[in-house]
A protein has these predicted regions:
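Glycine/alanine-rich phosphate-binding loops at beta-alpha junctions
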Residues: 25-65
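C-terminal catalytic domain of Rieske-type non-heme iron oxygenases
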Residues: 73-75, 80, 145-148, 153-424
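Generic structural signal for secondary-structure transition and capping sites
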Residues: 41-45, 93, 214
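Rieske [2Fe-2S] iron-sulfur-binding domain
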Residues: 54-160, 164-174
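Short, contiguous pre-domain boundary segments
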Residues: 4, 9-26
Protein backbone atom coordinates (compact mmCIF):
# COMPACT_ATOMS: atom_id res chain seq x y z
CA UNK A 1 0.00 0.00 0.00
CA UNK A 2 1.41 3.41 -0.99
CA UNK A 3 1.69 5.97 1.79
CA UNK A 4 0.57 9.47 0.81
CA UNK A 5 2.20 12.43 2.52
CA UNK A 6 1.52 16.14 2.36
CA UNK A 7 3.14 19.22 3.81
CA UNK A 8 1.08 21.46 6.09
CA UNK A 9 2.08 24.73 7.81
CA UNK A 10 3.44 24.45 11.32
CA UNK A 11 0.87 27.06 12.33
CA UNK A 12 -2.60 25.51 12.08
CA UNK A 13 -5.01 28.47 12.04
CA UNK A 14 -8.61 27.22 11.82
CA UNK A 15 -11.11 29.94 12.84
CA UNK A 16 -14.13 27.85 11.81
CA UNK A 17 -13.21 25.27 14.45
CA UNK A 18 -11.99 27.89 16.94
CA UNK A 19 -8.64 26.13 16.82
CA UNK A 20 -5.12 27.56 16.63
CA UNK A 21 -2.15 25.23 17.00
CA UNK A 22 1.62 25.44 16.56
CA UNK A 23 3.64 22.33 15.81
CA UNK A 24 6.32 21.73 18.42
CA UNK A 25 8.95 21.23 15.72
CA UNK A 26 8.88 25.03 15.46
CA UNK A 27 10.57 25.07 18.87
CA UNK A 28 12.97 22.15 18.44
CA UNK A 29 14.02 21.80 14.80
CA UNK A 30 17.62 22.73 13.88
CA UNK A 31 16.43 23.35 10.31
CA UNK A 32 13.84 25.87 11.51
CA UNK A 33 16.50 27.56 13.65
CA UNK A 34 18.77 27.96 10.61
CA UNK A 35 15.96 29.26 8.38
CA UNK A 36 14.91 31.84 10.99
CA UNK A 37 18.34 33.46 10.87
CA UNK A 38 17.60 34.68 7.35
CA UNK A 39 13.83 34.69 6.93
CA UNK A 40 13.02 36.31 10.29
CA UNK A 41 16.11 38.13 11.54
CA UNK A 42 17.45 38.95 8.09
CA UNK A 43 14.30 40.75 6.92
CA UNK A 44 12.82 42.47 10.00
CA UNK A 45 13.59 45.68 11.86
CA UNK A 46 15.65 44.75 14.94
CA UNK A 47 16.26 46.86 18.03
CA UNK A 48 19.85 48.07 18.39
CA UNK A 49 19.70 50.49 21.30
CA UNK A 50 18.57 53.89 22.50
CA UNK A 51 20.03 57.19 21.34
CA UNK A 52 20.71 58.17 24.96
CA UNK A 53 23.32 55.41 25.13
CA UNK A 54 25.44 57.38 22.67
CA UNK A 55 24.61 60.87 23.90
CA UNK A 56 27.96 62.55 23.12
CA UNK A 57 30.12 62.54 19.98
CA UNK A 58 32.26 59.42 19.96
CA UNK A 59 30.04 57.50 22.40
CA UNK A 60 29.51 53.90 21.31
CA UNK A 61 27.94 50.61 22.36
CA UNK A 62 28.78 47.21 20.96
CA UNK A 63 26.25 44.38 20.84
CA UNK A 64 25.05 41.47 18.72
CA UNK A 65 21.89 42.18 16.73
CA UNK A 66 20.15 39.41 14.86
CA UNK A 67 23.12 37.18 15.56
CA UNK A 68 25.58 39.58 13.91
CA UNK A 69 28.24 41.73 15.62
CA UNK A 70 27.36 45.44 15.28
CA UNK A 71 28.19 48.67 17.05
CA UNK A 72 26.34 51.95 17.36
CA UNK A 73 28.29 55.22 17.55
CA UNK A 74 27.55 58.94 17.43
CA UNK A 75 29.75 60.56 14.81
CA UNK A 76 32.08 63.29 16.09
CA UNK A 77 31.76 65.43 12.96
CA UNK A 78 28.08 65.10 12.07
CA UNK A 79 26.56 64.22 15.45
CA UNK A 80 24.57 61.53 13.66
CA UNK A 81 24.02 58.04 15.05
CA UNK A 82 25.52 55.27 12.92
CA UNK A 83 25.20 51.50 13.12
CA UNK A 84 28.13 49.61 11.59
CA UNK A 85 29.01 45.99 11.02
CA UNK A 86 31.70 45.29 13.59
CA UNK A 87 34.27 43.90 11.19
CA UNK A 88 37.40 45.37 9.65
CA UNK A 89 37.16 45.87 5.89
CA UNK A 90 40.74 44.62 5.58
CA UNK A 91 40.73 41.07 6.93
CA UNK A 92 37.65 40.83 9.12
CA UNK A 93 38.65 41.21 12.78
CA UNK A 94 36.27 43.21 15.00
CA UNK A 95 37.20 46.87 15.30
CA UNK A 96 35.07 47.77 18.35
CA UNK A 97 36.30 45.49 21.12
CA UNK A 98 34.70 47.01 24.24
CA UNK A 99 31.04 46.95 25.23
CA UNK A 100 30.75 50.72 25.53
CA UNK A 101 32.78 53.87 25.85
CA UNK A 102 33.91 56.95 23.97
CA UNK A 103 36.48 56.91 21.19
CA UNK A 104 37.84 59.25 18.54
CA UNK A 105 38.87 56.30 16.38
CA UNK A 106 38.43 52.53 16.22
CA UNK A 107 41.60 50.61 15.46
CA UNK A 108 41.68 47.00 14.35
CA UNK A 109 44.24 45.24 16.54
CA UNK A 110 45.23 42.82 13.75
CA UNK A 111 46.88 45.17 11.22
CA UNK A 112 46.07 48.52 12.88
CA UNK A 113 43.72 49.82 10.23
CA UNK A 114 41.97 52.77 11.86
CA UNK A 115 38.48 54.20 11.34
CA UNK A 116 36.93 57.41 12.65
CA UNK A 117 33.55 57.65 14.38
CA UNK A 118 31.86 58.41 11.06
CA UNK A 119 33.15 55.08 9.72
CA UNK A 120 35.77 56.55 7.39
CA UNK A 121 39.07 54.74 6.94
CA UNK A 122 41.47 57.15 8.64
CA UNK A 123 44.73 55.26 8.82
CA UNK A 124 46.54 52.37 7.10
CA UNK A 125 50.09 51.43 8.18
CA UNK A 126 52.40 51.34 5.18
CA UNK A 127 49.83 52.97 2.94
CA UNK A 128 52.51 53.71 0.33
CA UNK A 129 52.79 49.97 -0.35
CA UNK A 130 49.35 49.94 -1.95
CA UNK A 131 48.84 50.81 -5.59
CA UNK A 132 47.91 54.40 -6.34
CA UNK A 133 44.65 53.38 -7.99
CA UNK A 134 43.26 51.57 -4.93
CA UNK A 135 40.12 53.37 -3.72
CA UNK A 136 40.58 53.56 0.05
CA UNK A 137 37.25 55.36 0.45
CA UNK A 138 35.54 52.12 -0.57
CA UNK A 139 37.16 50.43 2.43
CA UNK A 140 35.32 52.45 5.08
CA UNK A 141 33.26 50.64 7.71
CA UNK A 142 30.07 49.11 6.34
CA UNK A 143 26.83 50.49 7.74
CA UNK A 144 23.87 48.15 8.08
CA UNK A 145 21.56 48.09 5.07
CA UNK A 146 18.95 50.24 6.86
CA UNK A 147 18.99 52.19 10.12
CA UNK A 148 16.14 54.31 11.44
CA UNK A 149 15.09 55.71 14.79
CA UNK A 150 11.66 56.16 16.34
CA UNK A 151 11.63 58.70 19.17
CA UNK A 152 15.05 57.63 20.37
CA UNK A 153 14.67 53.87 19.79
CA UNK A 154 17.22 52.83 17.16
CA UNK A 155 16.50 49.92 14.84
CA UNK A 156 18.50 48.25 12.08
CA UNK A 157 17.62 45.91 9.23
CA UNK A 158 19.84 43.81 7.01
CA UNK A 159 17.26 44.08 4.21
CA UNK A 160 17.66 47.26 2.16
CA UNK A 161 14.14 46.79 0.77
CA UNK A 162 12.38 46.54 4.13
CA UNK A 163 9.47 48.95 4.63
CA UNK A 164 10.17 52.16 6.56
CA UNK A 165 10.30 51.82 10.33
CA UNK A 166 7.19 53.87 11.12
CA UNK A 167 5.09 51.70 8.80
CA UNK A 168 6.65 48.54 10.19
CA UNK A 169 5.87 49.53 13.80
CA UNK A 170 2.21 50.01 12.88
CA UNK A 171 0.03 50.04 16.03
CA UNK A 172 3.06 49.61 18.31
CA UNK A 173 3.82 53.33 17.87
CA UNK A 174 0.84 54.23 20.06
CA UNK A 175 2.32 52.29 22.97
CA UNK A 176 5.85 53.59 22.54
CA UNK A 177 4.34 57.08 22.56
CA UNK A 178 2.60 56.38 25.87
CA UNK A 179 5.94 55.44 27.43
CA UNK A 180 7.82 58.42 26.05
CA UNK A 181 5.10 61.02 26.61
CA UNK A 182 4.61 60.01 30.24
CA UNK A 183 7.91 61.72 31.08
CA UNK A 184 8.32 65.48 31.44
CA UNK A 185 11.91 65.19 30.20
CA UNK A 186 13.71 63.04 27.65
CA UNK A 187 14.00 59.33 28.34
CA UNK A 188 17.38 57.72 28.92
CA UNK A 189 18.74 54.24 29.45
CA UNK A 190 19.80 53.77 33.06
CA UNK A 191 23.38 52.53 33.33
CA UNK A 192 23.74 48.79 33.74
CA UNK A 193 22.14 45.79 32.06
CA UNK A 194 20.70 42.42 32.97
CA UNK A 195 22.15 39.62 30.84
CA UNK A 196 21.18 35.98 31.17
CA UNK A 197 20.41 32.92 29.09
CA UNK A 198 17.35 30.68 29.00
CA UNK A 199 17.52 27.05 27.90
CA UNK A 200 14.43 27.33 25.73
CA UNK A 201 13.39 28.38 22.24
CA UNK A 202 13.27 32.15 21.76
CA UNK A 203 9.65 32.15 20.58
CA UNK A 204 8.52 30.90 23.97
CA UNK A 205 9.68 34.18 25.52
CA UNK A 206 7.86 36.12 22.80
CA UNK A 207 4.69 34.30 23.87
CA UNK A 208 5.37 34.58 27.59
CA UNK A 209 5.99 38.33 27.47
CA UNK A 210 2.41 39.01 26.36
CA UNK A 211 0.70 36.10 28.13
CA UNK A 212 -1.80 37.24 30.75
CA UNK A 213 -3.17 33.73 31.28
CA UNK A 214 -0.12 32.51 33.21
CA UNK A 215 0.25 35.39 35.66
CA UNK A 216 -1.86 34.23 38.62
CA UNK A 217 -0.66 30.62 38.61
CA UNK A 218 3.01 31.17 37.74
CA UNK A 219 3.58 34.29 39.85
CA UNK A 220 1.50 33.27 42.85
CA UNK A 221 4.31 34.16 45.27
CA UNK A 222 4.45 37.74 43.99
CA UNK A 223 0.71 38.25 44.33
CA UNK A 224 0.84 36.98 47.91
CA UNK A 225 3.68 39.43 48.56
CA UNK A 226 1.58 42.31 47.22
CA UNK A 227 -1.41 41.33 49.33
CA UNK A 228 0.81 41.19 52.41
CA UNK A 229 1.87 44.79 51.67
CA UNK A 230 -1.75 45.95 51.55
CA UNK A 231 -2.55 45.78 47.84
CA UNK A 232 -6.20 45.06 47.06
CA UNK A 233 -6.38 42.36 44.37
CA UNK A 234 -9.95 41.21 45.03
CA UNK A 235 -11.18 42.55 41.71
CA UNK A 236 -8.59 40.62 39.74
CA UNK A 237 -6.61 42.09 36.90
CA UNK A 238 -8.81 43.43 34.11
CA UNK A 239 -7.57 44.30 30.66
CA UNK A 240 -7.43 43.50 26.99
CA UNK A 241 -5.09 42.19 24.31
CA UNK A 242 -4.52 43.66 20.85
CA UNK A 243 -3.03 42.59 17.55
CA UNK A 244 -1.07 45.69 16.46
CA UNK A 245 -0.17 44.51 12.96
CA UNK A 246 3.04 43.08 11.47
CA UNK A 247 3.35 40.54 14.28
CA UNK A 248 3.36 43.15 17.07
CA UNK A 249 0.97 42.73 19.99
CA UNK A 250 0.19 44.19 23.39
CA UNK A 251 -1.33 43.19 26.69
CA UNK A 252 -2.87 46.22 28.46
CA UNK A 253 -4.41 45.86 31.90
CA UNK A 254 -5.25 47.66 35.12
CA UNK A 255 -2.44 48.11 37.65
CA UNK A 256 -3.93 47.36 41.09
CA UNK A 257 -0.40 47.19 42.54
CA UNK A 258 0.30 50.76 41.44
CA UNK A 259 2.79 52.46 39.17
CA UNK A 260 5.71 54.44 40.59
CA UNK A 261 5.22 57.22 38.05
CA UNK A 262 1.72 58.27 39.10
CA UNK A 263 -0.41 55.69 40.94
CA UNK A 264 0.26 55.36 44.65
CA UNK A 265 -0.20 52.06 46.50
CA UNK A 266 0.79 51.12 50.08
CA UNK A 267 3.89 49.22 48.93
CA UNK A 268 5.48 52.57 47.94
CA UNK A 269 5.23 53.89 51.49
CA UNK A 270 3.23 56.76 52.97
CA UNK A 271 6.04 59.27 52.38
CA UNK A 272 5.67 58.80 48.61
CA UNK A 273 1.93 59.52 48.45
CA UNK A 274 2.17 63.30 48.00
CA UNK A 275 5.02 63.09 45.51
CA UNK A 276 3.18 60.56 43.32
CA UNK A 277 0.01 62.70 43.48
CA UNK A 278 2.03 65.62 42.10
CA UNK A 279 3.33 63.45 39.27
CA UNK A 280 -0.21 62.48 38.36
CA UNK A 281 -1.32 66.11 38.38
CA UNK A 282 1.52 66.86 35.97
CA UNK A 283 0.33 64.14 33.60
CA UNK A 284 -3.20 65.55 33.63
CA UNK A 285 -1.91 69.06 32.93
CA UNK A 286 0.14 67.88 29.95
CA UNK A 287 -2.15 65.28 28.41
CA UNK A 288 -5.68 65.67 29.77
CA UNK A 289 -7.51 63.40 32.20
CA UNK A 290 -8.24 60.52 29.81
CA UNK A 291 -4.72 60.00 28.44
CA UNK A 292 -3.15 60.74 31.82
CA UNK A 293 -5.32 58.06 33.43
CA UNK A 294 -4.18 55.56 30.83
CA UNK A 295 -0.53 56.40 31.52
CA UNK A 296 -0.96 56.29 35.29
CA UNK A 297 -3.43 53.48 35.89
CA UNK A 298 -2.64 50.79 33.30
CA UNK A 299 0.28 48.51 32.58
CA UNK A 300 1.43 47.44 29.14
CA UNK A 301 3.46 44.48 27.92
CA UNK A 302 4.40 45.35 24.34
CA UNK A 303 5.95 42.90 21.88
CA UNK A 304 7.58 44.43 18.83
CA UNK A 305 8.12 41.59 16.39
CA UNK A 306 10.25 39.61 16.36
CA UNK A 307 12.27 39.94 19.58
CA UNK A 308 11.81 43.25 21.40
CA UNK A 309 9.65 43.61 24.51
CA UNK A 310 8.86 46.87 26.28
CA UNK A 311 7.37 46.21 29.71
CA UNK A 312 5.71 49.42 30.90
CA UNK A 313 4.71 48.22 34.34
CA UNK A 314 6.30 48.90 37.76
CA UNK A 315 9.18 50.30 35.75
CA UNK A 316 9.92 50.53 32.02
CA UNK A 317 12.06 47.65 30.86
CA UNK A 318 13.39 47.15 27.34
CA UNK A 319 14.30 43.54 26.66
CA UNK A 320 15.69 41.70 23.64
CA UNK A 321 16.25 37.99 23.18
CA UNK A 322 18.22 36.24 20.47
CA UNK A 323 18.42 32.51 19.76
CA UNK A 324 21.83 30.88 19.89
CA UNK A 325 20.43 27.36 19.39
CA UNK A 326 16.96 25.82 18.92
CA UNK A 327 16.77 25.40 22.70
CA UNK A 328 18.71 28.41 23.95
CA UNK A 329 18.36 32.20 23.89
CA UNK A 330 20.43 35.08 25.21
CA UNK A 331 18.45 37.84 26.93
CA UNK A 332 19.47 41.44 27.58
CA UNK A 333 17.36 43.94 29.53
CA UNK A 334 17.73 47.66 30.15
CA UNK A 335 15.76 50.10 32.27
CA UNK A 336 14.71 53.43 30.76
CA UNK A 337 13.58 56.44 32.77
CA UNK A 338 13.08 60.21 32.48
CA UNK A 339 16.49 61.87 32.45
CA UNK A 340 15.61 64.54 35.02
CA UNK A 341 13.44 62.58 37.44
CA UNK A 342 13.94 62.99 41.18
CA UNK A 343 16.52 60.75 42.81
CA UNK A 344 13.98 59.12 45.14
CA UNK A 345 11.67 58.36 42.21
CA UNK A 346 14.55 56.85 40.25
CA UNK A 347 15.38 54.63 43.22
CA UNK A 348 11.76 53.53 43.56
CA UNK A 349 11.68 52.73 39.85
CA UNK A 350 14.85 50.63 40.06
CA UNK A 351 13.64 48.85 43.19
CA UNK A 352 10.43 47.92 41.35
CA UNK A 353 12.42 46.78 38.33
CA UNK A 354 14.68 44.51 40.35
CA UNK A 355 11.90 43.20 42.60
CA UNK A 356 9.76 41.89 39.75
CA UNK A 357 11.64 41.80 36.43
CA UNK A 358 15.26 41.42 37.46
CA UNK A 359 16.90 38.00 36.96
CA UNK A 360 16.64 37.43 40.73
CA UNK A 361 13.22 39.07 41.10
CA UNK A 362 9.80 37.54 41.61
CA UNK A 363 8.81 37.14 37.94
CA UNK A 364 11.82 36.32 35.80
CA UNK A 365 12.95 33.16 37.64
CA UNK A 366 9.35 31.89 37.52
CA UNK A 367 9.16 32.51 33.79
CA UNK A 368 12.55 30.96 33.09
CA UNK A 369 11.53 27.82 34.97
CA UNK A 370 8.26 27.66 33.01
CA UNK A 371 9.90 28.08 29.60
CA UNK A 372 12.69 25.61 30.31
CA UNK A 373 10.07 23.15 31.57
CA UNK A 374 8.20 23.49 28.26
CA UNK A 375 11.38 22.89 26.28
CA UNK A 376 12.11 19.81 28.37
CA UNK A 377 8.58 18.54 27.80
CA UNK A 378 8.98 18.78 24.03
CA UNK A 379 11.68 16.11 24.20
CA UNK A 380 9.05 13.49 25.00
CA UNK A 381 7.83 13.56 21.42
CA UNK A 382 4.49 12.24 22.54
CA UNK A 383 2.47 15.38 21.75
CA UNK A 384 2.90 17.19 18.43
CA UNK A 385 0.99 20.46 18.84
CA UNK A 386 0.79 23.40 21.25
CA UNK A 387 -2.69 24.87 21.61
CA UNK A 388 -3.12 28.67 21.42
CA UNK A 389 -6.90 28.78 20.89
CA UNK A 390 -8.06 30.61 24.01
CA UNK A 391 -10.54 33.39 23.24
CA UNK A 392 -10.97 32.74 19.51
CA UNK A 393 -14.75 33.15 19.71
CA UNK A 394 -14.88 36.48 21.57
CA UNK A 395 -13.36 39.94 21.86
CA UNK A 396 -9.85 39.49 23.29
CA UNK A 397 -9.40 39.75 27.04
CA UNK A 398 -6.15 40.06 28.97
CA UNK A 399 -5.97 36.34 29.70
CA UNK A 400 -6.78 35.24 26.14
CA UNK A 401 -4.24 34.36 23.45
CA UNK A 402 -5.12 36.61 20.48
CA UNK A 403 -1.89 38.54 20.96
CA UNK A 404 0.18 35.34 20.64
CA UNK A 405 -1.72 34.34 17.52
CA UNK A 406 -0.71 37.67 15.97
CA UNK A 407 2.96 36.80 16.52
CA UNK A 408 2.62 33.30 15.10
CA UNK A 409 0.71 34.38 12.00
CA UNK A 410 3.50 36.78 11.11
CA UNK A 411 6.11 34.11 11.83
CA UNK A 412 4.40 31.63 9.50
CA UNK A 413 4.06 34.30 6.82
CA UNK A 414 7.78 35.04 6.90
CA UNK A 415 8.88 31.41 7.16
CA UNK A 416 6.64 30.24 4.32
CA UNK A 417 7.32 26.76 3.02
CA UNK A 418 10.34 26.44 5.32
CA UNK A 419 7.90 26.02 8.23
CA UNK A 420 5.84 23.15 6.89
CA UNK A 421 5.51 19.67 8.33
CA UNK A 422 5.24 16.45 6.34
CA UNK A 423 2.13 14.64 7.51
CA UNK A 424 1.14 11.07 6.61
Amino acid sequence: MTMVSSAIPMVDDDPARHRFRVHRDAMTSPEIFREEADRIFGHSWLYVGHESEVASPGDYVRRPVGGRPLFMVRGAKTGQVHVFHNTCTHRGAVVCRHKSGNAKVFQCFYHAWTFDSEGNLAGVPGREAYGENLDFSALSLRPVARMESYRGFVFASFDENVTDLATYLAGAREYLDLVIDSADSKMEVVKGTNEYCIQANWKLLAENSIDGYHAVSTHDTYFKYLIALGTNLKGGVQGTARDLGNGHAVLEYAAPWGRPIAKWEPLFGEDAREEIAELRAGLVARHGEERASRMADTNRNLLIYPNLVVNDIMAVTVRTFMPSAPDRMDVTAWEIAPRDELAQLRQRRLDSFLTFLGPAGFATPDDIEALESCQLGYRSGGVEWNDISRGMDRAPEANDEAQMRAFWRRWQQQMGDAACKEMR
